[in-house]
UniProtKB/Swiss-Prot annotation:
Binds 3 Mg(2+) or Mn(2+) ions per subunit. The gene is ISPS. It comes from Populus tremuloides (Quaking aspen). PANTHER family: OS04G0344100 PROTEIN-RELATED, TERPENE SYNTHASE 12-RELATED. Mg(2+) 3 binds at N489, S493, E497. Dimethylallyl diphosphate binds at D345, E423, R486, N489. This is Isoprene synthase, chloroplastic.
Length: 595
C-alpha cells in the first residue's frame, strides 16, 4: 500500500499532456492506467517489507509516453495512397542520377543531396553505377585538380560506397611546409566538405587528421554575422556531430527542412523526400503498434517497479539501427531485446542481490524453463518473459528461413548476463578494475553484441555458416560498434554512476589506471572513439566477410550511440530534446510539399 500511495502522489497527468502531438481534446488518465503505471500488484509478485527497505533504488524517471495514443492510428491506408506518386517522382530522380551528360560535380552534389534527404536506399544501384562511371572516366582525377569542395565531396562519397581512394588527393591543397593553404578558409563550402570527408579516415592517415584539425579550427571562428544565418546553421550542425556519425532519419528530417529553404532546391527531389519520409514514418507506426502490444502483454514494466520502462526509447533506438522500411522484423527484434536489456540491467545494477544475480545468470546459461523454480518471484517473471520471447523469435526464423538460431541467441544472452554479473561483483566488492579489465568486459555489457546478433538474423536472408561462426567469436563488425556504444554511454553516465557508488566506468578506470585527471581521462576516451571509428571505416571499403546491409546495420548502432548519448544519457533520462526527436521520427509527419 505504501508503494501505491507514493506513486499516486506523482503528477501523473504530465505523462498524458507532454511529449506527443497536441490533440484537440484532453485525454484523461483512467484509474486503470494509474494503477498499471504506478503500483506493484502483491497478488502475483511478493516482496517482504524487509527486502523492500534494503533494496537499492536508482530513482529512475517513470515512463512518460501514452501507449493508448501511440496505438490509436491506422497508417496502412496512407502508405498505399502515396505509393504511385512516389514511384513517379522516383523515376524522375533516377533519370537525373543516370544522366551521363551531367557535369561530374553536379552529379556528386545530387547524390549527396539524395543521401542526406534519406533517399539513398531507393537508389543504391543507380548511385553505384554513377560512381563507377565517375571513377572509370577519370572524373576523380579531374575533380581533384579543380576544387577542394569537389575533391572532398567525391572522396567522401567514394569511401562511403566502398571505393578505395587515397588521402593523397588532398596533398595538392597544402603548401611547401605541409600545411593546408590559408586561402582555403575563405571558401566555407569547401571547408565544410573537407571537415565531413576527414571522418572517413582510416588508421594512419595523417593528412586526413590534419585536415580535420584545420577545418575545425576555421569553422569555429565563423559567426552568423560573417557568413549569414543559413550557412551558420549548417556549420553549427556539422560541428555538433559530423554527417558520418549521424543517424539517418534524424539527418533526413533536418536536411529536408534545410533544403526546402534553398532557392535552387530540386523541387522533384524535395517532394519525393517529404513523401518518402512520411511513408516510412507510417511503417514505423505500424511496427510500434505491434511492439507496444507485445510489451503490454509481457507486463514487466507494471510489475518490476524498480526498473526503467523504456519501450518507446528502445524502439526509437531500433529505428536508428535499421531505418529502411523493409526491416520491420529487425526493428521489432532489437526493440524487444533493448527493452529486456534495460530492465535486466537494472536488476543487476540496482535491485538484485549477488546471490540472486548468480542464480539468474545460471538460469539463462542453462536455458531451462524449470530453472525458474530456483529464482525469486520478480526474477521468475523476467526470466519466463525472456524465455518465451526469444524462443518465439527463434521459432519464427526456423519457420521462415529453415535455420535453428536458438543456440546463438541464448549464447548472446548468457554472455551478456555474465558481463552484467562481473560488473555487479565489482560493485559489491567496491573495487575499481584496471581500464583493460573493465573495458574487456564492458563492451559486451553494453548489449551491442547481443543486439547485432539479433539484427543479423533479422536482416540477412541467406544465413551462412562462416558468418555465424564469426558472429559467435564477436568479429570486428560486432565488437567495434559495441566499443563505441560503451564509450559513448560511459561518457554520458559517468557522473550518475559514481553518485550511485558504481566505480566501474571507462572514465574512472582510465583515471585510476593512468593516474590522470577526469578531464584528461574524458579526452582520452573521446580519442578512443575516434580511433575505433577509423578501424570500423575499413569495413566499408569492400572485402568484408559480411554483406553490405549488415555492415551498415552494425555501423548504424555506433551512430545511434552518438545520437543517444551525445548530450547525456537520453535512454535512462530522456529530456525534452530526446522526446522531440522521437516524435519527429515516429509520429510527426513533415508538412506536405507545396509548389
Amino acid at each position: 500500500m505504501a508503494t501505491e500511495l507514493l506513486c499516486l502522489h506523482r503528477p501523473i497527468s504530465l505523462t498524458h499532456k507532454l511529449f506527443r502531438n497536441p490533440l484537440p481534446k484532453v485525454i484523461q488518465a483512467t484509474p486503470l492506467t494509474l494503477k498499471l503505471r504506478c503500483s506493484v500488484s502483491t497478488e502475483n509478485v511478493s516482496f517482504s517489507e524487509t527486502e523492500t527497505e534494503t533494496r537499492r533504488s536508482a530513482n529512475y524517471e517513470p515512463n512518460s509516453w501514452d501507449y493508448d495514443y501511440l496505438l490509436s492510428s491506422d497508417t496502412d491506408e496512407s502508405i498505399e495512397v502515396h505509393k504511385d506518386k512516389a514511384k513517379k517522382l522516383e523515376a524522375e530522380v533516377r533519370r537525373e542520377i543516370n544522366n551521363e551528360k551531367a557535369e561530374f560535380l553536379t552529379l556528386l552534389e545530387l547524390i549527396d543531396n539524395v543521401q542526406r534527404l534519406g533517399l539513398g536506399y531507393r537508389f543504391e544501384s543507380d548511385i553505384r553505377r554513377a560512381l563507377d562511371r565517375f571513377v572509370s572516366s577519370g572524373g576523380f582525377d579531374g575533380v581533384t585538380k579543380t576544387s577542394l569542395h569537389g575533391t572532398a565531396l567525391s572522396f567522401r562519397l567514394l569511401r562511403q560506397h566502398g571505393f578505395e581512394v587515397s588521402q593523397e588527393a588532398f596533398s595538392g591543397f597544402k603548401d611547401q611546409n605541409g600545411n593546408f593553404l590559408e586561402n582555403l578558409k575563405e571558401d566555407i563550402k569547401a571547408i565544410l566538405s573537407l571537415y565531413e570527408a576527414s571522418f572517413l579516415a582510416l588508421e594512419g592517415e595523417n593528412i586526413l587528421d590534419e585536415a580535420k584539425v584545420f577545418a575545425i579550427s576555421h569553422l569555429k571562428e565563423l559567426s552568423e554575422e560573417k557568413i549569414g544565418k543559413e550557412l551558420a546553421e549548417q556549420v553549427s550542425h556539422a560541428l555538433e556531430l559530423p554527417l558520418h556519425r549521424r543517424t539517418q532519419r534524424l539527418e533526413a528530417v533536418w536536411s529536408i527542412e534545410a533544403y526546402r529553404k534553398k532557392e535552387d532546391a530540386n523541387q522533384v527531389l524535395l517532394e519525393l523526400a517529404i513523401l518518402d519520409y512520411n511513408m516510412i514514418q507510417s511503417v514505423y507506426q505500424r511496427d510500434l503498434r505491434e511492439t507496444s502490444r507485445w510489451w503490454r502483454r509481457v507486463g514487466l514494466a507494471t510489475k518490476l517497479h524498480f526498473a526503467r520502462d523504456r519501450l518507446i526509447e528502445s524502439f526509437y533506438w531500433a529505428v536508428g539501427v535499421a531505418f529502411e522500411p523493409q526491416y520491420s522484423d529487425c526493428r521489432n527484434s532489437v526493440a524487444k531485446m533493448f527493452s529486456f536489456v534495460t530492465i535486466i540491467d537494472d536488476i543487476y545494477d540496482v535491485y538484485g542481490t549477488l546471490d540472486e544475480l548468480e542464480l539468474f545468470t545460471d538460469a539463462v546459461e542453462r536455458w531451462d524453463v524449470n530453472a525458474i523454480n530456483d529464482l525469486p518471484d520478480y526474477m521468475k517473471l523476467c526470466f519466463l518473459a525472456l524465455y518465451n520471447t526469444i524462443n518465439e523469435i527463434a521459432y519464427d526464423n526456423l519457420k521462415d528461413k529453415g535455420e535453428n538460431i536458438l543456440p546463438y541467441l541464448t549464447k548472446a544472452w548468457a554472455d551478456l548476463c555474465n558481463a552484467f554479473l562481473q560488473e555487479a561483483k565489482w560493485l559489491y566488492n567496491k573495487s575499481t578494475p584496471t581500464f583493460d579489465d573493465y573495458f574487456g568486459n564492458a563492451w559486451k555489457s553494453s548489449s551491442g553484441p547481443l543486439q547485432l546478433i539479433f539484427a543479423y538474423f533479422a536482416v540477412v536472408q541467406n544465413i551462412k555458416k562462416e558468418e555465424i561462426e564469426n558472429l559467435q567469436k564477436y568479429h570486428d563488425i560486432i565488437s567495434r560498434p559495441s566499443h563505441i556504444f560503451r564509450l559513448c554511454n560511459d561518457l554520458a553516465s559517468a557522473s550518475a554512476e559514481i553518485a550511485r557508488g558504481e566505480t566501474a566506468n571507462s572514465v574512472s578506470c582510465y583515471m585510476r589506471t593512468k593516474g590522470i585527471s577526469e578531464e584528461l581521462a574524458t579526452e582520452s576516451v573521446m580519442n578512443l572513439i575516434d580511433e575505433t571509428w577509423k578501424k570500423m571505416n575499413k569495413e566499408k571499403l569492400g572485402g568484408s566477410l559480411f554483406a553490405k546491409p549488415f555492415v551498415e546495420t552494425a555501423i548504424n548502432l555506433a551512430r545511434q550511440s552518438h545520437c543517444t548519448y551525445h548530450n547525456g544519457d537520453a535512454h535512462t533520462s530522456p529530456d525534452e530534446l530526446t522526446r522531440k526527436r522521437v516524435l519527429s521520427v515516429i509520429t510527426e509527419p513533415i508538412l506536405p510539399f507545396e509548389r
